[in-house]
């Protein structure tokens, strides 16, 4: 086997009892690969482990978990200064794994791990909200965000992404669209939004293609607004067809400003952020990520 530089796996604490993962790591170590492993316990651990990875001189920091873990590790990487910043590797171990799925990361642990260590490192974009919080995949607001935020952890653990749909149907009678105004480059819209998707990536909420035209290295954010006065009729309409659907508003820009008369909540790769004013901008070529050669999200 060819020699590969060392890597450090930052593993979400929920995945520590994953026996197949342990076996895959041990097998690669026996083949001569150097793989350090660190386990997160609380917020901030990933940033500390990234600094440790740089001291080790590893070529790759692997995010082992769901979209939230990928977000935390990638955010820590783009905050690094200097040369020789490690690339991001992805090992999908979460409930939905939306970003990993959309970029074509293999489901098989051994294949995903090998890609994370030895795949080509390609410069990709990230997005930043209000000059602080970042996301690598998508910011979603409205009905869908409240569902994913409020869905019980036990339900997600038992049913996976289907749990979001079940919980949404249970809450249908209590949820209303959000009134807001959105501006971007050559874009302006105001009205009642059922769901707002601002994507660097394409899908969220367990496989929902909210921004099907998004690319992760084009310097743009894709916007999709699903409109409607009543939740259920509008939801049925948006699920039918995208073509000439009056309930779907689309736009593309390197930035978007969102204003609302009341607090609305955006889900940034699984992390909620509430407020009335949001400035979301793309950070072009913010980090390098090890991706498959046929990744569909590259231009």
Curated annotation (Swiss-Prot):
Keyword Iron-sulfur: no
Annotated EC: 2.7.1.-
Domain DAGKc: 2-133
Required cofactor(s): Mg(2+); Ca(2+)
Family (UniProt): Belongs to the diacylglycerol/lipid kinase family. YegS lipid kinase subfamily.
Subunit structure: Monomer.
Protein name according to UniProt: Lipid kinase YegS
Organism whose genome encodes this protein: Escherichia coli (strain K12)
Lineage of the organism: Bacteria, Pseudomonadati, Pseudomonadota, Gammaproteobacteria, Enterobacterales
Gene name of the record: yegS
